[in-house]
Every structure is written in structure tokens, then in C-alpha cells.
Amino acid sequence: MEIKYLSLCILAGILFVSQVNASENNGKDDVKYAALTQKDLDALPVEKRASVLDELGFIHEYGLGVPMNREQALQYYKQACELGGNYGCYNVKYAYQYGDGVAKDSAQANKYAKKMNLDNLLIEQEYIDKFSQGIYAAKVLADTDKSQRPEFINALFNLLNNRPESDALFFSRIGFNQEKTFRLATLWVQDGDPQMDYQLGLLTLNDFSGHYVDEPYKARPASLKWFRAAAEKGVVEAQSLLGGIYSGGEG
């Protein structure tokens, strides 16, 4: 299983709210991004423009506030990649490697992978390729099989939670961060899988949304909504977690 490979990579040391309201706020932001014109984009500083193009790629890839359009997502990621290599390059690699919105083309996949900015990354190129391969193999499973989604989100949680800045930078360069993981889980929880309720509880508790930076004490009560939903649907981990909270007089 590819996700087990991710865990092995970590062990080997290669890399050292109301949530309903949060979802609504994200949706409003997605619509604002989608309304940007090329003139708006051209007026932005290069680094900001690359970040916005990456965001446009993400929302079109998953249909967040806009119709899902993998072909359009690819074009945004390509544009982002060309602006310094900090965003989008490995998203393009993924698309060409797996034929996501485009015909498979290993030459194009490698071409865009090489455009990624390697500055300040404490990981050698061979490990970047090997590690990203494991992540993207898990991603394609989650994209094509809904039952794999909770496990993929859990893998991202383990990879991104409480990591050094250098690790966070690496994951961002290949297309993953805490906030995107939270938004994916918020989207996929609509599939009705109780395991996703549990994963969303973990992400909320650890503030992957970034909504509780100034008020971290609010993350715990907000997470209980999702843990309770998971527990009521029979998720043993959620039942155990809530049991510990209630026995301690909390919740």
C-alpha cells in the first residue's frame, strides 16, 4: 500500500469551527479568486501572482466554488510553475504522470518537475522524486476511489502536523499544505464516510484551517462536532477519544 510507504519514509528519516462557517468562508474566497481576470493577475507582484495561480489551479482541480475542470487547473498550475518554481510544478508533473486532465506524457512530467525551485530545501533531488512519487500514488487512489480518501487525509495529517519549516516548504513546493488538506477533508466529508468525520476532527483540533491561530483554545471544542459525528457512526477511535474527554470532565 502506497500510504504505508509514506510512513516508512518518515521512519527512515528522509524528512525529519463552527466548521460550517469555515467552509462557507472558504467558498466565498474561492468565488473571489475565480472572478479574477488576466488583467487582475498581471497587476500582482510575481510571487503573489504565482500563489494566486496555484490557488486557482487547486479550486478548479477539485471544484471548490467553481465547476471542476482538471484541464483548466493544469493551465493555472503551468502558469504558476513558470513564475519561479515555487508553486505548481509538481502538480503539473502529477497531471502528466497520471493522465489527469491531459494525456500521459513522462517527458512533460519530468520537464516540469525540474522547474521546481530547490532553494532552501533540505532534501536531495533523488529523495524529492521518490517521496513525491509515494504521495502522488496515494493521491491518485484518493482521486479515483472514495474509500481511500480518509487514509490519504490521515497520511497528509501525519506528514504535515508539527513539522519543521523546511519540511513545510518542501510539501508546499510539491502541492500540499495544512490549509489545502483541511479544505479537501471539508469537501470529502460530504461523501458520508464516518472515517472522514474523524479525520476532520483531527485536522480541526490541530488547526489545519488556520482559523484559530489567535484563539487556539477554540480548536478543541470545534473539533468535538466531528468526533461526535464519527463516534455516533461507530468509529472506534472517535469513541475512545470522546470517552477520555468525558471521563476527564471535559466536553
Each predicted region: which residue ranges?
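Classical Sec-dependent N-terminal signal peptides that target proteins to the secretory pathway
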Residues: 1-24
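TPR/TPR-like (Sel1-like) alpha-helical repeat modules
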Residues: 104-121
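Helix-start (N-cap) detector for alpha-helical repeat units in TPR-like alpha-solenoids
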Residues: 50-51, 86-88, 194-196, 236-238
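Hydrophobic face of amphipathic alpha-helices that form TPR/SEL1-like repeat modules
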Residues: 53-62, 91-98, 137, 158, ...
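Short coil/turn and helix-start
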Residues: 46, 64-68, 82, 98-104, ...
